[in-house]
Design a protein with these regions (language model features):
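Active-site/ligand-binding loops adjacent to catalytic centers
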Residues: 1-51, 95-117
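Substrate-binding/catalytic subdomain of NAD(P)-dependent oxidoreductase enzymes
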Residues: 38-45, 49-65, 76-78
Length: 117
């Protein structure tokens, strides 16, 4: 069970291909916790402005985990593909975001709230 609904599959159809890719690339397959996924989810949104779904954040969470464990090669380029748009699974952003500020329909007031004036 995981919050990452797109990868919440008991018996994935492409498991054999995933293992073949892992072996062929001399990579690894590991797991991350929901807490690690949500931390990566928030990080990529805050630092890069990218709105991903939790399933896409799982790869980033894995990279962060490997860095913390000092298991990343220093002489290699690492790529994490994030293909799942955050609009696929908006419940987690709604649950984890702060309450929105409600302002009147007024351009000057809106600009002030977001720090433009």
């Amino acid at each position: 069970e995981t919050i990452a609904t797109a990868i919440r599959i008991g018996n994935p159809a492409s498991w054999d291909q995933a293992v073949a890719a892992q072996v062929g690339s001399k990579g690894l397959i590991d797991s991350v916790t929901d807490k690690e996924i949500l931390s990566a989810y928030r990080l990529v949104a805050a630092k890069e402005g990218i709105f991903v779904e939790p399933s896409s954040a799982a790869g980033i969470a894995g990279l962060i985990k490997l860095k913390a464990l000092k298991k990343l090669p220093k002489d290699k380029t690492i790529v994490v593909t994030v293909t799942g748009n955050g609009l696929k699974d908006v419940q987690w952003v709604l649950n984890s975001s702060t309450k929105p500020i409600i302002i009147p329909v007024d351009v000057k007031k809106a600009a002030k709230v977001i720090g433009l004036k």
